[in-house]
A protein has these predicted regions:
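Extended alpha-helical targeting/anchoring segments
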Residues: 1-251
């Protein structure tokens, strides 16, 4: 209400206990419940990470003459319907919702600005806007933002320009992150960060063989397991939502 933010994504952790089974079994169960997307099981280290995120942070294929990068921010949600007709109506309502479209386009504009830091001049474009993706329990609104990266761009440059993804911060990005730090009780950890794969030179890309290729998700719908001194395993999953001046407590 003070006019400092258009939108902020506020999150909080949910915790529970893993009473039986293994991290691998839990990950398999999560994948059955949320198939597809950009899942990852990070088993190295004392705290396994189980991510069934549907959200692409970026997909980048670099080559000597410059690369191609795609970001697909996810902003806008509606529940799946109980019947085919209701389901179609829910998707149509999401596509037409002024509030959801406004939230989505704010983040699209933010990503366009972030990508411009590493993009060749006049190469940033939005080939898909307000697309609805059907997931098992919800409809999600996504948009595609693409650019050609400048020759010599490194993966470090990509992260410096884009991280963290604007869909989990808000806009303006820096002020939203400052507000998140002030309001949220603890750091988010891997939740809302980035998990991905970097592939070596020689991978096929849109313009031939790549010098590097990288795909990273935004780890929403992600569980972190921590073993306690008593042998019990605590499971933590972050949840959150974008808040605007038009948001209500019921939503």
């Amino acid at each position: 209400s003070a006019g400092e933010l258009y939108q902020v994504t506020y999150t909080a952790p949910l915790t529970g206990s893993l009473r039986q089974g293994s991290a691998a079994a839990l990950f398999a169960a999560l994948q059955r419940a949320q198939p597809g997307g950009y899942a990852a099981h990070m088993a190295a280290g004392p705290e396994p990470v189980l991510s069934v995120s549907p959200e692409l942070f970026f997909d980048w294929h670099d080559a000597s003459g410059g690369g191609r990068i795609l970001a697909r921010p996810m902003k806008g949600t509606a529940a799946r319907g109980a019947t085919p007709a209701d389901d179609a109506a829910q998707a149509a309502h999401l596509r037409a919702s002024p509030k959801e479209r406004a939230e989505n386009v704010m983040i699209v504009d933010l990503l366009r600005n972030d990508l411009s830091r590493i993009a060749q001049p006049h190469s940033v474009r939005v080939p898909a806007l307000f697309h609805t993706e059907g997931l098992p329990t919800v409809w999600q609104m996504t948009s595609d933002v693409q650019a050609r990266t400048r020759p010599g761009t490194t993966l470090g440059d990509v992260f410096a320009a884009l991280f963290p993804c604007g869909s989990v911060t808000g806009a303006p990005k820096v002020r939203a992150m400052q507000m998140i730090r002030a309001l949220e009780a603890a750091p988010r950890g891997v939740y809302c960060g980035a998990i991905g794969v970097v592939r070596p030179a020689g991978v096929a890309g849109p313009d031939g063989l790549c010098s590097v290729a990288a795909t990273f998700n935004v780890p929403i719908r992600t569980v972190v397991l921590r073993a306690g001194a008593d042998g019990a395993t605590t499971a933590t999953c972050g949840i959150g939502s974008g808040i605007t001046s038009g948001a209500t407590a019921d939503a």
